[in-house]
Regions:
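Basic, low-complexity segments
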Residues: 1-20
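Polybasic low-complexity intrinsically disordered regions
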Residues: 18-39, 45, 49, 73-182, ...
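A generic secondary-structure boundary signal that marks alpha-helix termini
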Residues: 42, 56, 73, 192, ...
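DNA-binding alpha-helical recognition surfaces that contact promoter or target DNA
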Residues: 49, 66, 224
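A short, basic/aromatic helix-end/turn motif that makes direct DNA contacts
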Residues: 50-54
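Major-groove recognition helix of helix-turn-helix-like DNA-binding domains
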Residues: 57-73
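Helix-centered, glycine/charged polyanion-binding patches within enzymatic domains
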Residues: 165-233
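Basic, amphipathic alpha-helical segments enriched in Lys/Arg and hydrophobic/aromatic residues
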Residues: 205, 209-284
Length: 284
């Protein structure tokens, strides 16, 4: 609760959700309840019942749904920026999908049912050094990965970026060249170049480093971590609540990352992560 209060204070958020609305619950109480819901994989009714059992003041089910519907993507991206850090040495770009529902595919095959194909597309950037998500873009209707790459890079401060062949676009390399960012993206070969003046993507291919590029695999590992901990499907129906659901899972990953790393570590590493986690929690 104190960590959420500090984050909202740094974002200069108002005390209440709306200046003309009722002043019964403060804004941080809604955010805490939503983050607990995402972390524990509960429904709106169950998280209200769970917090009531613990004696924690919590808004009603409909109030939580209203808050999740009204929160904009800019707010969640600012939370990701605060919980991941200001500067990043290497950023990895990649995309993954979340299914709309969680059906039993075994049952669907047995009854010759139709396999659902529409999913939610998550395009995000991960800081390689601290394994935290620093920017994200969610599309309810899937689109190509490259369409969100430039918007993600504009939100972060980095020196190097690694991505797969799907992000090999000349305008992305031009942006990296103008902002002194090293782009390690494998070249998509369409055949021999017809022009003598090489494009920025072919100039970047001359400095391509496989050692740096293979660090991109860490973002796929973090995708698996998020889906195992918080679920690989979303139960929300509206576009705004679906986005809040996925953004909240990324914020939970950033906040509880140090604590999760303690499990399964040696005694020396465990003490190191405990000290850093306490510094992170108590930081203003």
């Amino acid at each position: 609760v104190n960590k959420v209060k500090r984050l909202l204070k740094q974002l200069k958020c108002p005390m209440y959700g709306h200046r003309f609305g009722p002043k019964k619950y403060k804004f941080y109480e809604n955010i805490v309840a939503l983050l607990i819901r995402y972390y524990c994989r509960l429904s709106y009714r169950r998280v209200v019942y769970f917090l009531d059992l613990l004696g924690i003041k919590c808004p009603s089910k409909s109030a939580l749904q209203y808050t999740a519907n009204k929160i904009k993507s800019e707010f969640w991206n600012r939370l990701l920026e605060l919980t991941s850090g200001a500067k990043h040495e290497i950023i990895a770009l990649d995309a993954t999908g979340f299914s709309r529902t969680n059906p039993s595919y075994h049952y669907l095959r047995r009854i010759d049912g139709k396999i659902p194909k529409i999913y939610v597309k998550l395009n995000t950037g991960l800081s390689i050094l601290n394994r935290k998500f620093c920017a994200a873009k969610i599309r309810i209707i899937p689109a190509h990965d490259i369409k969100d790459a430039l918007a993600l890079l504009r939100k972060v401060n980095t020196r190097k970026v690694v991505a797969d062949k799907g992000y090999d676009a000349n305008y992305l390399h031009e942006y990296c060249f103008s902002n002194n960012i090293e782009a390690h993206i494998p070249l998509r070969e369409y055949g021999k170049s017809k022009h003598k003046n090489w494009s920025k993507r072919r100039l970047a291919a001359k400095h391509f480093d496989k050692t740096v590029y293979h660090q991109r695999e860490l973002i796929e590992s973090c995708f698996g971590s998020v889906k195992r901990k918080y679920g690989s499907s979303v139960n929300s129906k509206k576009a705004s609540t679906i986005k809040s659901d996925i953004y909240g899972r990324l914020v939970c990953h950033n906040i509880f990352y140090y604590f999760i790393r303690v499990l399964g570590q040696s005694h020396a590493n465990r003490n190191f992560y405990i000290i850093n986690y306490n510094i992170f929690i108590n930081s203003d």
